[in-house]
Each structure stands twice: as structure tokens, then as C-alpha cells.
């Protein structure tokens, strides 16, 4: 049976956790894009910027479900640094992997159990998008490591 209010549910907390994570990812990817551009990786810079915009859209979709007020959450987020473009791609792929294999499937399952099927579907779909982001980053990592990026 579908619920009408998120207030006091784990799904409400999960949405805020995911919103914060997507918002941070957007900023990290923007920072990583600047570093890639500085290192001469124009195409990778554009991919980071494109992905940052997609993360913004994910954050927007999640934020629209929230009902306002104050909510206390406990979550861990990467307190990483801006490294080389290769290091940044590796960090990004790691984060996307965590989201698509653990966080979003778990959050979708909880939303479904709590009676929020529409939210569960959105969470599942964002997880699919994160899987694509991970595969894209891993392909770029391979191309840099194999010296085939510009070939």
C-alpha cells in the first residue's frame, strides 16, 4: 500500500543522503573537469562536466520528493582531494560503483518496503545511470593506462 507522507521514514533520510551525495558529486566532477582541462584532457573535461550536469538532475529529482523541515542524518562522504586526472577518474569510478551496487539498490528496496513505489523506481533508475557513469569512467581509465586515449 502506497504511503502519502515521507515524514519520519527511512526513505526520507535516504533521499536526503542521496541528494547530498549527488550534490557533492556534481561539485567534485566540476573540479575534476578543470584539472583534466589543465592537464590537456579536453574530452575528459567535457565528460566530467556532462556527468556533473547529470548528477545535478539526479539531485533535483531526489529533492522534489522531500517535504521540507529539518532532518538529521548520519552519512559518510568522500573527503577526497583533487588529484591527477587518472586519480580523479579512479575516485569517480569508485564512488559510482558504490552508488550503483550498494546505495541505490538498498534505498530503492527500502522505499518499496515502506510503500513508496514511485520513489523506489526513481532510485532504481538513478542507480542504472550511475552504472553507466562508472563504465564510462573505467573505459577512460583503461584508455589512459593503455596509452590509447588519443588513438
Task: Identify what each model region corresponds to.
Residues 1-151:
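Non-heme di-metal
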Amino acid at each position: 500500500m502506497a504511503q502519502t507522507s515521507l515524514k519520519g521514514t527511512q526513505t526520507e533520510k535516504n533521499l536526503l543522503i542521496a541528494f547530498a551525495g549527488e550534490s557533492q558529486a556534481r561539485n567534485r566532477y566540476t573540479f575534476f573537469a578543470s584539472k583534466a582541462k589543465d592537464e590537456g584532457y579536453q574530452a575528459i573535461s567535457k565528460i566530467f562536466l556532462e556527468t556533473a550536469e547529470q548528477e545535478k538532475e539526479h539531485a533535483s529529482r531526489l529533492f522534489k520528493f522531500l517535504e521540507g523541515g529539518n532532518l538529521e542524518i548520519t552519512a559518510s562522504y568522500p573527503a577526497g582531494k583533487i588529484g591527477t586526472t587518472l586519480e580523479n577518474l579512479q575516485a569517480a569510478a569508485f564512488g559510482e560503483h558504490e552508488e550503483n551496487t550498494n546505495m541505490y539498490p538498498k534505498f530503492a528496496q527500502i522505499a518499496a518496503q515502506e510503500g513508496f513505489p514511485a520513489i523506489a523506481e526513481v532510485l532504481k533508475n538513478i542507480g542504472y545511470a550511475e552504472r553507466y557513469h562508472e563504465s564510462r569512467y573505467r573505459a577512460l581509465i583503461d584508455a589512459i593506462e593503455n596509452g590509447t586515449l588519443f588513438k
